[in-house]
């Protein structure tokens, strides 16, 4: 397990050895639950999971930077599902709002209403958890713009 951990590369590279190390540490703890090394194994697993968490977040941000907003939202949500207590949660939720808004803005007319609704829903999810965030002003701006766009769309229809 320790060898696999030492082979585990930086977060931006293939993480096969990271997964292998986590599995091996877990296997050790399952076979030797009374071992004095269990606490050490848990600490090392936590460190390895942190690397996977960073990789997941950075991959989603890459899609965001490439303006693949729909894919970015999917990957940001995957990050939250796989790492619910992530240190990046505030930024992830904010980037979901931003990605949803930009995706809606660049959508065809018939899809805009649904997609601006998604922006508003993601805003509410964000403020429920981070009502005093450093991203709050910007998030509110996307929320207000989405409301305006929805009003325009609903008045046309």
Which residues fall in each region the model found?
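Acidic, polar-rich low-complexity tracts and alpha-helical solenoid repeat scaffolds
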Residues: 1-157
């Amino acid at each position: 397990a320790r060898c696999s951990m030492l082979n585990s590369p930086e977060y931006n590279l293939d993480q096969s050895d990271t997964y292998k190390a986590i599995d091996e540490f877990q296997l050790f703890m399952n076979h030797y639950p009374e071992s004095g090394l269990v606490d050490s194994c848990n600490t090392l697993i936590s460190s390895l999971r942190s690397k996977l968490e960073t990789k997941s977040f950075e991959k989603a941000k890459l899609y965001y930077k490439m303006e693949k907003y729909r894919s970015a939202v999917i990957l940001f949500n995957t990050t939250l599902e796989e790492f619910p207590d992530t240190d990046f949660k505030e930024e992830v939720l904010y980037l979901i709002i931003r990605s949803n808004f930009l995706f809606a803005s660049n959508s065809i007319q018939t899809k805009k209403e649904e997609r601006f609704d998604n922006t508003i829903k993601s805003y509410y999810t964000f403020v429920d958890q981070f009502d005093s965030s450093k991203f709050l002003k910007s998030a509110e701006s996307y929320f207000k713009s989405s409301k305006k766009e929805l009003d325009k769309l609903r008045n046309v229809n």
